[in-house]
Amino acid sequence: MKRKVLLIPLIIFLAIAAALLWQLARNAEGDDPTNLESALIGKPVPKFRLESLDNPGQFYQADVLTQGKPVLLNVWATWCPTCRAEHQYLNQLSAQGIRVVGMNYKDDRQKAISWLKELGNPYALSLFDGDGMLGLDLGVYGAPETFLIDGNGIIRYRHAGDLNPRVWEEEIKPLWEKYSKEAAQ
Protein backbone atom coordinates (compact mmCIF):
# COMPACT_ATOMS: atom_id res chain seq x y z
CA MET A 1 0.00 0.00 0.00
CA LYS A 2 2.80 2.42 0.93
CA ARG A 3 4.55 1.67 -2.35
CA LYS A 4 1.45 2.72 -4.34
CA VAL A 5 1.11 5.94 -2.35
CA LEU A 6 4.75 6.79 -3.06
CA LEU A 7 4.20 6.30 -6.81
CA ILE A 8 1.44 8.91 -7.04
CA PRO A 9 3.76 11.97 -6.76
CA LEU A 10 6.13 10.38 -9.30
CA ILE A 11 3.29 9.83 -11.77
CA ILE A 12 2.08 13.41 -11.32
CA PHE A 13 5.61 14.74 -11.82
CA LEU A 14 6.08 12.68 -15.00
CA ALA A 15 2.74 13.88 -16.40
CA ILE A 16 3.66 17.53 -15.78
CA ALA A 17 7.13 17.02 -17.28
CA ALA A 18 5.62 15.36 -20.37
CA ALA A 19 3.16 18.24 -20.85
CA LEU A 20 5.96 20.77 -20.50
CA LEU A 21 8.18 18.96 -23.01
CA TRP A 22 5.27 18.66 -25.44
CA GLN A 23 4.62 22.43 -25.28
CA LEU A 24 8.33 23.22 -25.69
CA ALA A 25 8.43 21.00 -28.79
CA ARG A 26 5.40 22.83 -30.22
CA ASN A 27 7.07 26.19 -29.59
CA ALA A 28 10.27 24.98 -31.28
CA GLU A 29 8.21 24.04 -34.34
CA GLY A 30 6.87 27.57 -34.60
CA ASP A 31 3.69 27.27 -32.56
CA ASP A 32 3.95 30.67 -30.90
CA PRO A 33 1.48 31.10 -28.02
CA THR A 34 1.47 34.89 -28.58
CA ASN A 35 -0.05 34.36 -32.03
CA LEU A 36 -3.49 33.53 -30.76
CA GLU A 37 -6.03 34.33 -33.44
CA SER A 38 -8.56 36.93 -32.36
CA ALA A 39 -12.22 36.05 -32.77
CA LEU A 40 -12.75 39.72 -33.66
CA ILE A 41 -10.75 39.70 -36.92
CA GLY A 42 -13.14 40.84 -39.64
CA LYS A 43 -15.61 42.26 -37.13
CA PRO A 44 -16.30 45.84 -36.03
CA VAL A 45 -14.55 47.31 -33.01
CA PRO A 46 -16.77 46.69 -29.97
CA LYS A 47 -18.84 49.68 -28.91
CA PHE A 48 -17.31 51.61 -26.06
CA ARG A 49 -17.37 54.85 -24.14
CA LEU A 50 -13.98 55.67 -22.64
CA GLU A 51 -12.52 58.74 -21.04
CA SER A 52 -9.58 60.58 -22.50
CA LEU A 53 -6.40 59.72 -20.60
CA ASP A 54 -5.27 63.31 -20.21
CA ASN A 55 -8.66 65.08 -20.24
CA PRO A 56 -10.87 63.45 -17.58
CA GLY A 57 -14.52 64.08 -18.33
CA GLN A 58 -13.99 64.00 -22.10
CA PHE A 59 -15.41 60.76 -23.49
CA TYR A 60 -14.86 58.97 -26.77
CA GLN A 61 -16.79 56.26 -28.52
CA ALA A 62 -15.89 53.67 -31.17
CA ASP A 63 -16.40 56.19 -33.98
CA VAL A 64 -12.96 57.69 -33.18
CA LEU A 65 -11.58 54.53 -34.76
CA THR A 66 -13.76 54.77 -37.89
CA GLN A 67 -12.57 57.90 -39.63
CA GLY A 68 -12.08 56.57 -43.15
CA LYS A 69 -8.40 55.67 -42.76
CA PRO A 70 -6.64 52.81 -40.98
CA VAL A 71 -5.52 53.24 -37.40
CA LEU A 72 -3.39 51.26 -34.99
CA LEU A 73 -4.95 50.76 -31.56
CA ASN A 74 -2.07 50.18 -29.15
CA VAL A 75 -2.88 48.71 -25.72
CA TRP A 76 -0.23 49.74 -23.18
CA ALA A 77 0.46 50.32 -19.49
CA THR A 78 3.18 51.76 -17.30
CA TRP A 79 3.48 48.45 -15.43
CA CYS A 80 4.43 46.73 -18.70
CA PRO A 81 8.20 46.59 -19.41
CA THR A 82 7.62 45.49 -23.01
CA CYS A 83 5.49 48.60 -23.57
CA ARG A 84 8.51 50.72 -22.66
CA ALA A 85 10.64 48.72 -25.10
CA GLU A 86 8.23 49.32 -28.01
CA HIS A 87 7.49 52.96 -27.20
CA GLN A 88 10.31 54.58 -29.18
CA TYR A 89 9.28 52.65 -32.28
CA LEU A 90 5.70 53.87 -31.84
CA ASN A 91 7.10 57.43 -31.71
CA GLN A 92 8.89 56.74 -35.01
CA LEU A 93 5.75 55.36 -36.68
CA SER A 94 3.74 58.33 -35.50
CA ALA A 95 6.38 60.72 -36.90
CA GLN A 96 6.00 58.92 -40.26
CA GLY A 97 2.28 59.73 -40.31
CA ILE A 98 0.95 56.41 -39.03
CA ARG A 99 -2.14 57.17 -36.94
CA VAL A 100 -1.81 55.46 -33.57
CA VAL A 101 -4.48 55.60 -30.88
CA GLY A 102 -3.32 54.54 -27.43
CA MET A 103 -5.43 52.70 -24.92
CA ASN A 104 -3.96 52.83 -21.43
CA TYR A 105 -5.00 49.53 -19.86
CA LYS A 106 -5.68 48.86 -16.16
CA ASP A 107 -3.26 51.54 -15.06
CA ASP A 108 -2.86 54.57 -12.83
CA ARG A 109 -3.87 57.65 -14.83
CA GLN A 110 -1.26 60.01 -13.35
CA LYS A 111 1.57 57.52 -13.84
CA ALA A 112 0.48 57.07 -17.46
CA ILE A 113 0.39 60.82 -18.12
CA SER A 114 3.85 61.24 -16.58
CA TRP A 115 5.15 58.29 -18.59
CA LEU A 116 4.02 59.88 -21.87
CA LYS A 117 5.59 63.21 -20.89
CA GLU A 118 8.88 61.44 -20.15
CA LEU A 119 9.02 59.15 -23.21
CA GLY A 120 7.06 61.17 -25.77
CA ASN A 121 3.49 60.73 -26.89
CA PRO A 122 3.02 58.87 -30.17
CA TYR A 123 -0.75 58.77 -29.80
CA ALA A 124 -3.13 60.90 -31.85
CA LEU A 125 -5.58 60.15 -29.06
CA SER A 126 -5.13 58.49 -25.66
CA LEU A 127 -8.00 56.49 -24.21
CA PHE A 128 -8.15 55.42 -20.56
CA ASP A 129 -9.43 51.88 -19.91
CA GLY A 130 -8.84 51.87 -16.17
CA ASP A 131 -11.22 49.01 -15.42
CA GLY A 132 -10.15 46.99 -18.47
CA MET A 133 -13.65 46.57 -19.90
CA LEU A 134 -12.77 47.48 -23.50
CA GLY A 135 -9.69 45.30 -23.16
CA LEU A 136 -11.96 42.45 -22.11
CA ASP A 137 -14.24 43.07 -25.10
CA LEU A 138 -11.20 43.03 -27.40
CA GLY A 139 -9.87 39.81 -25.89
CA VAL A 140 -6.76 41.49 -24.51
CA TYR A 141 -4.87 39.22 -22.16
CA GLY A 142 -1.87 41.45 -21.53
CA ALA A 143 0.02 44.45 -22.74
CA PRO A 144 1.21 45.43 -25.20
CA GLU A 145 -1.21 44.41 -27.90
CA THR A 146 -1.80 46.25 -31.15
CA PHE A 147 -4.83 46.08 -33.41
CA LEU A 148 -4.98 47.25 -37.02
CA ILE A 149 -8.41 48.73 -37.66
CA ASP A 150 -9.47 49.71 -41.17
CA GLY A 151 -11.19 52.99 -42.03
CA ASN A 152 -14.62 51.43 -41.50
CA GLY A 153 -13.83 50.31 -37.96
CA ILE A 154 -13.24 46.65 -38.82
CA ILE A 155 -10.48 44.87 -36.91
CA ARG A 156 -8.10 43.45 -39.52
CA TYR A 157 -5.14 42.25 -37.45
CA ARG A 158 -4.06 41.71 -33.86
CA HIS A 159 -0.51 41.47 -32.59
CA ALA A 160 0.27 40.44 -29.01
CA GLY A 161 3.70 41.62 -27.91
CA ASP A 162 5.90 44.54 -28.83
CA LEU A 163 5.48 46.32 -32.12
CA ASN A 164 8.99 46.46 -33.54
CA PRO A 165 10.51 47.04 -37.00
CA ARG A 166 10.30 43.36 -37.98
CA VAL A 167 6.66 43.01 -36.94
CA TRP A 168 5.79 46.27 -38.70
CA GLU A 169 7.59 45.47 -41.97
CA GLU A 170 6.62 41.81 -42.24
CA GLU A 171 3.17 41.65 -40.69
CA ILE A 172 1.41 44.97 -40.28
CA LYS A 173 2.76 47.35 -42.95
CA PRO A 174 1.51 45.28 -45.93
CA LEU A 175 -1.99 45.27 -44.40
CA TRP A 176 -1.70 48.97 -43.52
CA GLU A 177 -0.86 49.77 -47.14
CA LYS A 178 -3.71 47.59 -48.44
CA TYR A 179 -6.32 49.27 -46.25
CA SER A 180 -4.86 52.73 -46.89
CA LYS A 181 -5.29 52.17 -50.65
CA GLU A 182 -8.84 50.94 -50.15
CA ALA A 183 -9.63 54.03 -48.09
CA ALA A 184 -8.24 56.31 -50.82
CA GLN A 185 -10.57 54.86 -53.49
From Swiss-Prot:
Periplasmic side: 26-185
Protein location: Cell inner membrane
Phylogenetic lineage: Bacteria, Pseudomonadati, Pseudomonadota, Gammaproteobacteria, Enterobacterales
SUPFAM superfamilies named in the record: Thioredoxin-like
Gene3D superfamilies assigned to the protein according to its UniProt record, in alphabetical order: Glutaredoxin
Domain of life per record: Bacteria
Record key words, sorted: Cell inner membrane, Cell membrane, Cytochrome c-type biogenesis, Disulfide bond, Membrane, Redox-active center, Transmembrane, Transmembrane helix
Name the UniProt record assigns to this protein: Thiol:disulfide interchange protein DsbE
This protein's encoding gene: dsbE
Entry similarity comment: Belongs to the thioredoxin family. DsbE subfamily.
